[in-house]
Amino acid sequence: VSGSDQTHWDDVYTSKAEAEVSWFQEEPEVSLSLLELVGARPDDAIVDIGGGASRLVDCLLDKGFTRVSVLDLSAAALAAAQARLGERAKAANWIAADARSWEPPESYDIWHDRAAFHFLTDAGDQQAYVERLNRGLAVGGHAIVGTFAPDGPEKCSGLPVVRHDADSLSRLFGPGYVVVDSRRHAHKTPWGAVQKFQFSTFRRVA
């Protein structure tokens, strides 16, 4: 089983309540502050990669954002988010797809990923993801990528991860991406454990 295994994630999202997964956040404060940092506007096209049942989409809709897409490998995760939002779910675009093979249908201003990329432990999978990033993010746009930090957990949801910092992501993303912010975050799980995250924000310049 790998982090790119759809069955694993469907099982997670159908067997556990929203607040029973380690990555649950009532409000994604770091992501929201970084969106503010990069000057996100309500009409910006934003894609949340591996968004699952995250509440980021709720917060963006609350703030008046009108072009929000949520991509996840697990249709069950997206269904959970849609059920939570009810009628409001129609205001977002829901994409059940693999970030390594998905063909972005438009050019996004902001590419957000909290804890999806770090599940890609294979160099080929990482490169496939970066190819989609290159196809999907507009030049001048921003990529906000949250991963476990170098001193963070080695596994999540029972699966191995690759821990990153801004330097390791820069090497993978290439010279077309410039770091504009790098910060650590101690995420507290619903049961009180602390997971060390690293959020790296890039501006695409080429």
Task: Specify the residue positions occupied by each region the protein language model found.
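Conserved acidic residues
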Residues: 109
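Short catalytic micro-motifs in class I SAM-dependent methyltransferases
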Residues: 115-119
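A conserved beta-strand element that flanks and buttresses the S-adenosyl-L-methionine
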Residues: 112
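Class I (Rossmann-like) S-adenosyl-L-methionine-dependent methyltransferase catalytic domain
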Residues: 1-106, 120-136, 142-206
